[in-house]
């Protein structure tokens, strides 16, 4: 009789063999056994070579690596004799004659040089325990130039703010004065007076003659309307049809689409007359731009005009290249 063992009522079920727990039969011995396709480190061809000692010659660094900017002419460390000790900081009067681009470039040149000096000063002070006065003196000169650059930029910023405050009071007077001179100029001075109109629109409304450089905002759209009205008034004194169109518009252009069409037309009497006829057709068709959609619509117009101008420039360059190729072929 077998001795009884205590167990749970699920023990027999858990210990029972199933088709998943039965051991699989041993596979039959194969006659054609293939060799492994990958050679292991136990191969007899293994050769032990001497370790390669770490050295700078074993490392390669591209010449355009950004971290080279922390080194002066790719030198690990300059000696005090190699430093430029005869230079002086830029003076404020000298910096006032520089443009914003020049000041921006000079600022970052000074900043990079100070970073190079700070690294060299740290190496000399903590690694070689030598004197660092030469590095600190040059860094202080550069720092003087940098705070003077900020001083000049601050002067310009305050001058711009004060001029804007004063001009806000006199702006309308200036616009009326320019409009009077613009309309009273004789026809033989059209070229000069329209050049002054370009300077006027850039100074008052920020409208550049290069269409792709403009930022479309409320001031830009208001400037388009003002310039379009000025061009109509200029040629209304010479053309009766343009005069009638201006009277129909109550002596001002208020639609952004109409103003853009008149603004982009040539500064000639015939071109303005054609633009007036095109605007009449737009009005007859009921095509207008809502004031709420002016910015988005004008931005689309500007983008399309810029693309068209770029296509013309590309086509002209291709034609010029073809002509040069023909001339060279004829020469040969």
From Swiss-Prot:
Keywords: Coiled coil, Mitochondrion, Ribonucleoprotein, Ribosomal protein, Transit peptide. Pfam families: MRP-L47 (PF06984). One of its GO terms (cellular component) is mitochondrial large ribosomal subunit. GO terms for biological process: mitochondrial translation. InterPro entries: MRP-L47_sf, Ribosomal_uL29_mit. Residues 19-40 are annotated as: Disordered. It comes from the Eukaryota. The keyword Ribosomal protein applies. Component of the mitochondrial large ribosomal subunit. Mature mitochondrial ribosomes consist of a small (37S) and a large (54S) subunit. The 37S subunit contains at least 33 different proteins and 1 molecule of RNA (15S). The 54S subunit contains at least 45 different proteins and 1 molecule of RNA (21S). PANTHER family: LARGE RIBOSOMAL SUBUNIT PROTEIN UL29M, RIBOSOMAL PROTEIN L47, MITOCHONDRIAL-RELATED. Belongs to the universal ribosomal protein uL29 family. This is Large ribosomal subunit protein uL29m. The gene is MRPL4.
């Amino acid at each position: 009789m077998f001795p009884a063992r205590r167990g749970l009522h699920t023990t027999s079920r858990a210990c029972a063999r199933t088709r998943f727990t039965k051991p699989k039969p041993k596979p039959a011995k194969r006659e054609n056994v293939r060799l492994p396709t990958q050679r292991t480190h136990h191969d007899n061809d293994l050769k032990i070579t001497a370790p390669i000692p770490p050295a700078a010659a074993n490392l390669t660094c591209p010449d355009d690596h950004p971290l080279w900017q922390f080194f002066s002419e790719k030198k690990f460390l300059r000696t005090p004799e190699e430093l430029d000790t005869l230079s002086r900081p830029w003076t404020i009067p000298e910096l006032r004659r520089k443009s914003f681009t020049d000041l921006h470039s000079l600022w970052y040149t000074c900043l990079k040089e100070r970073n190079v000096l700070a690294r060299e000063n740290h190496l000399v002070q903590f690694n070689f325990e030598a004197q660092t006065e030469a590095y600190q003196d040059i860094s202080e000169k550069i720092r003087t130039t940098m705070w003077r650059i900020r001083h000049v930029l601050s002067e310009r910023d305050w001058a711009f703010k004060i001029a804007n405050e004063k001009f806000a009071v006199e702006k309308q007077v200036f616009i009326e004065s320019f409009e009077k001179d613009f309309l009273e100029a004789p026809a033989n001075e059209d070229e000069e007076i329209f050049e002054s109109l370009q300077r006027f629109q850039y100074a008052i409304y920020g409208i550049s003659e290069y269409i792709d450089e403009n930022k479309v905002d409320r001031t830009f759209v208001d400037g388009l309307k003002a310039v379009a009205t000025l061009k109509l008034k200029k040629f209304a004194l010479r053309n009766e049809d343009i005069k009638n169109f201006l009277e129909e518009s109550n002596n001002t252009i208020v639609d952004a689409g109409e103003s853009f069409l008149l603004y982009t037309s040539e500064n000639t009497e015939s071109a303005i007359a054609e633009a007036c006829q095109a605007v009449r057709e737009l009005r007859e068709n009921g095509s207008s731009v809502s004031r709420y959609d002016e910015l988005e619509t004008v931005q689309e117009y500007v983008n399309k005009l810029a693309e068209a101008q770029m296509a013309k420039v590309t086509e002209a360059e291709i034609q010029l290249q073809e002509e040069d190729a023909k001339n060279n072929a004829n020469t040969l």
